[in-house]
Amino acid sequence: MTTRGAVIQAAHYAETEARLQRDHIIVTMSVEMNRALPAEKASWVHEDGSPRFHFMQAANREYSRRGGKGGGHIGAVANALLANLKILEGDE
């Protein structure tokens, strides 16, 4: 059995993710990602809903490729995308 510890984040992590959620590149990526099949979406996250490392890397690469700047901490882009997907799916 694996036990995951608590995650402690500085306040600026959440601020960065909230800013990124409104970034036009992130919004566009979110809409495109919303078309993915449920199995693909499930592969992006752990059971607790946190992004998997490979998804964080892919999200950061694509954000940069599209001209994104100031992606913040390593999981910021992925967390912003996942938050937007929840909204698009009606979970928020």
Curated annotation (Swiss-Prot):
Q: Which gene encodes it?
A: 80
* Originating species: Mycobacterium phage L5
- What protein am I looking at? Gene 80 protein
